[in-house]
Amino acid sequence: QFMNSITENLNHIHSSIDSAVDNCKRDENSVKLLCVSKTKPKEMVIEAYNDGERHFGESYAVEASEKIEQLKELGYNDIVWHFIGPIQKNKTKLIATHFDIVESVDRVIVAKRLDEQRPDNLKPLEVLIQVNISDESQKSGCAIADIDELIKEIQSLKKLKLRGFMGIGKDTDSREEIQKEFAQLKNLFDK
C-alpha cells in the first residue's frame, strides 16, 4: 500500500526492512533498498535521492539512459544505476554505457556484448547472473545447467565483474516453495 509521498513510502519501507533485519539477526548494512524508478520522472528520483537513496533500478534502456544523463547534468553523479530487466541484444550499448550494475545477464552473447561495448574510461560493469530458479519457461534467466559456462565466460571478460546471482521465484503463497528456490540459489552461489 502506498502512502501520500515518496518520503512516507521510503520511511515505511525502511521500517519494514529494519524489522526484517532484526528478526533475521543480520547486519543492518547487509540489506540495501533498490528504488525502482522505471517510468518515473527524474523529479521523483531527485526526491528519493534527497531522502538518502542512492541505488535506482531501471528496465527500459532508452528511457533510462536519457534520465541518467539528465540527472548527471544536474550534478547527481553518485547514484548507482542498476539495470534490472530482460536484456535485448540491440540495447546492450546503452546498458554498457550508462549503468553501474546489471542484474539480469542470462546469456553468453549478452555478456560478450556488454564487455565489448563498455567504454574504456568506466570501471568494469558489475553483473549478476539471472538464474531461472523456478524453472518456469515464461521466466527469463540462465538455466541452472548452463551457469558454469556463463560464469567462466564472464570471468574471462576484462570489462565485467561478476558480483553474484539474481533469481525470481515462483509466484506462490507457499513460503516453503519460495525458501526452497532461494536456498537453491544460495547453494549455487556458495559452490
Residue ranges and their predicted role:
Residues 2-188:
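Conserved alpha/beta-domain cores
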